[in-house]
Amino acid sequence: MNVQYSVPETIIHLFGMEAVKQYYLEAGKKVFDELGPEALRRRGVTERVLYGDIGKTLAEEAEVFKADLIVMGTRGLNPVKGLLLGSVSNDLLARTKVPMLLLRDKTPPLTDKLRVGIFVDGSDYGAAAADFVLRNRELFGAKSEFTVVHASAPIPDPVAPNPVSPHMPTLTRQEREAEQRRVFADAVKPVIEPFEAAGLAVKAELVVGDADHALADYANKNLDIVVMGSHGYGNFKAAVLGSTAMHVAALTEAPILVIRKD
């Protein structure tokens, strides 16, 4: 699907709606021609050219089409490369609950043994991401490897005073490590159990460091695709993506499947 920007009403009055529509169709056809349309058609892919506000139009078409998944690049023709995601990606994420696969420069290998990482923090959004994977198992290949990944802040050295009250005894490193393991277990358990119940092999991985960079670094080194919820604990829910999801999306080279929890 290709959506062309709307033209001013004065242009429509000057040239006529039919001429404008023809221009849109020709411009959209050029986009599809660059993709190799014959190869797409052989796979049952149909082409559609629309015009209007791009994010709004795509969201409305996804609703009409009853799309199960939206696939798009994270950046289009917008030259502001400093933005974490393209404006169209952000706008569409804000308007739809349909899961979105955001493609970066790194293309996943053509294999049925994808290395799939599910990022969780213990919130319902991580559980929703895992639920999507289990309900759409065929999308990832018969031999895919699944890893549930959780990030934890490093334990300070020397160990800081008791966080509840500085007048209480300082927590030992062993106590801090035990708490870190407990939080990790609580975060991954609700995701691990459904996979095991479905008879699927899954492992859990704890990465230590700033969540944004630690998760992205792990993904870039170990994963072919990332699945994550759009938000987690401590994020401003009115934002399109939570801060961690936004930064991971910006720093990760692999495709990211973002699940928008109902």
Give the positions of each predicted feature.
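Active-site phosphate/pyrophosphate- and oxyanion-stabilizing loops and adjacent acidic/basic residues
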Residues: P37, N90, D131, H213, ...
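A short acidic, glycine-rich active-site loop
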Residues: M17-K30, P169-V183
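Small/aliphatic-rich secondary-structure junction motif
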Residues: M1-G16, K113-T170, E193-E205, K261
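Structural beta-alpha unit
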Residues: P8, F15-Q22, E26, K30, ...
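Glycine-rich, Arg-bearing micro-motifs that act as flexible, cationic patches
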Residues: M72-D91, K113, I225-L251
